[in-house]
């Protein structure tokens, strides 16, 4: 054993979950650039910096010689050339269809497992022009290394402001809403404050109990309705395809401020409305009606149960964090997987008023925020994995329809080694659902990325179309009311 291969660390419970058979989740980050990528610059940077990040210079080993039998992280020497791939691209062969080439290339990655004999990440440099970039960099890493927020903090640490290439990107301070709730009744008398505090506590306990019972039922038998976006789902090992769309973050903020809600509420409302209309189209096609997405004909069944697992960041400090703080020992904004899932029911129906889905989404999320199910779900997972193993959790996600995630990205345009980034699209594969939706804010943009099982959802661009239409209808309705 070499000197570099002496430090071992057991996997965290969440890392063990992501490594378990039948899950094997990986995160893919696609980054568009305004100019071609120089592979030599990327390789040189990795040689100097990869050793600073413990998970990116550690491989997975099975330890049987210590007090802990099982998988562990072992620090090892990294040969970066083994992790960076630059495929030869015949521009005549792809016939200027750069988007199709990138889509096919990344889809093939989902069928190629990461090599566990070395650190679980790789980078693919695709110097091909697409509709929104001159080149695309694809980073793939196993979910056991980190969650999306950790990876975003790592990416931001590697970039500089495009407006000033000597300056690090701005890292905005984001406070949890819960931290401000103590001031909610500050101007009222002690009696009113006491009554409200008791009512608040009772609601919190009740909501938590109900959510825990629903979580338990979901892990055992409580399934979503089989719909065109979930029927015939096979294994999480099936090939996945990815599609992204860029919309205006300013439009989302306009709706957020006008409706007095959060960005997450707006995104949930847009997704709920878009999936309703997409499902209406799919049911129409299935019934032979041949409806278009603009049709008012309601083809939806009477009752549909669709739930989304919404990712919740459990760190005390949310948003992008300085990388050195995340890597520090006992950090409150620690590196790794420190998030949970809250299962949110969707109201699937065709609404004539574009604002109704927003109000429904806000009502649902307000109740979920007034519950301790997210941190308790995380603690329960840790306890059961440490006690019984990981198999029990395979069913919880497979009994729901989709997963949603929203990650805060750079607040201004940034560059990597002087090459301006046009978009950041983060997604994943290995999950059992046929649909996963990620949102990432970048400067004044919101990038929507959809991961699908093409055997179940052959037209993911139609979902993005419906999301754009929903967002525009909501904005136009609010603009009309303000005139």
UniProtKB/Swiss-Prot annotation:
Pathway(s) this gene product operates in, as recorded in its UniProt entry: Glycerolipid metabolism; triacylglycerol biosynthesis; Lipid metabolism
Active site: 143 (proton acceptor)
InterPro entries (alphabetical): O-acyltransferase_WSD1-like (IPR045034), O-acyltransferase_WSD1_C (IPR009721), O-acyltransferase_WSD1_N (IPR004255)
Catalysed conversion reaction: an acyl-CoA + a 1,2-diacyl-sn-glycerol = a triacyl-sn-glycerol + CoA; a long chain fatty alcohol + a fatty acyl-CoA = a wax ester + CoA
Enzyme class label: transferase
Keywords: Acyltransferase, Cell membrane, Endoplasmic reticulum, Glycoprotein, Membrane, Stress response, Transferase, Transmembrane, Transmembrane helix
Lumenal side: 223-483
Coiled coil start-end: none
Glycosylation sites: 394, 399
One GO-annotated biological process of the protein: triglyceride biosynthetic process
Pfam families: WS_DGAT_C, WS_DGAT_cat
Ranges facing Cytoplasmic side: 1-203
EC number: 2.3.1.20, 2.3.1.75
Subcellular location: Cell membrane; Endoplasmic reticulum membrane
Highest taxon above the source species: Eukaryota
Tissue expr: Mostly expressed in roots.
Membrane topology: Single-pass membrane protein
Role: Bifunctional wax ester synthase/diacylglycerol acyltransferase. Involved in cuticular wax biosynthesis.
Protein name per Swiss-Prot or TrEMBL: Wax ester synthase/diacylglycerol acyltransferase 10
Gene name tied to this protein: WSD10
């Amino acid at each position: 054993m070499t000197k570099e291969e002496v430090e071992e660390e057991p996997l965290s419970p969440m890392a063990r979950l992501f490594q378990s058979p039948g899950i094997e989740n990986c995160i893919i980050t696609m980054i568009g650039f305004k100019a071609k990528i120089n592979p030599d610059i990327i390789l040189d940077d990795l040689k100097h910096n990869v050793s600073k990040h413990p998970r990116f210079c550690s491989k997975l080993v099975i330890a049987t010689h210590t007090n802990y039998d099982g998988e562990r992280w072992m620090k090892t020497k990294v040969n970066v050339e083994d992790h960076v791939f630059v495929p030869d691209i015949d521009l005549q062969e792809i016939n200027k269809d750069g988007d199709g080439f990138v889509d096919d290339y990344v889809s093939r990655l989902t069928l190629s497992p990461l090599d566990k004999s070395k650190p679980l990440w790789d980078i693919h440099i695709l110097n091909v022009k697409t509709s929104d970039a001159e080149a695309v960099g694809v980073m793939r890493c196993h979910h056991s290394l980190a969650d999306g927020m950790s990876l975003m903090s790592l990416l931001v640490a590697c970039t500089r402001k495009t407006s000033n290439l000597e300056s690090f990107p701005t890292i905005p301070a984001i406070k949890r809403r819960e931290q401000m709730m103590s001031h909610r009744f500050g101007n009222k008398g002690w009696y009113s404050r006491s009554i409200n505090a008791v009512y608040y506590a009772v609601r919190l306990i009740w909501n938590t109990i109900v959510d825990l019972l629903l979580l338990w039922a979901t892990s055992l038998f409580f399934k979503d309705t089989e719909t065109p976006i979930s029927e015939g789902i096979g294994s999480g090992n099936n090939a996945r395809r990815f599609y992204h769309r860029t919309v205006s973050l300013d439009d989302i903020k306009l709706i957020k401020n006008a409706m007095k809600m959060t960005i997450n509420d707006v995104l949930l409302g847009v997704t709920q409305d878009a999936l309703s209309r997409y499902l209406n189209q799919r049911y129409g096609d299935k019934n032979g009606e041949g409806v278009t997405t603009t049709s008012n004909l309601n083809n939806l069944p009477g009752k549909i149960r669709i739930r989304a697992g919404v990712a919740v960041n459990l760190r005390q400090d949310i948003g992008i964090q300085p990388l050195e703080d995340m890597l520090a020992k006992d950090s409150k904004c620690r590196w790794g997987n420190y998030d949970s899932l809250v299962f949110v029911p969707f109201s699937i129906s065709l609404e004539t008023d574009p604002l109704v889905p927003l109000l429904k989404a806000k009502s649902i999320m307000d109740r979920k925020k007034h519950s301790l199910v997210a941190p308790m779900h995380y603690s329960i997972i840790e306890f059961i994995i440490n006690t019984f193993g990981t198999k029990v959790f395979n069913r919880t996600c497979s009994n729901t329809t989709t997963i949603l995630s929203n990650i805060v990205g750079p607040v201004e345009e940034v560059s990597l080694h002087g090459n301006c980034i046009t978009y950041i699209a983060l997604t994943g594969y290995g999950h059992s659902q046929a649909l996963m939706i990620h949102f990432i804010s970048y400067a004044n943009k919101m990038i929507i990325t959809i991961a699908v099982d093409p055997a179940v959802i052959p037209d993911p661009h139609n979902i993005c179309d419906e999301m754009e239409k929903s967002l525009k209808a909501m904005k136009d309705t609010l603009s009309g009311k303000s005139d």
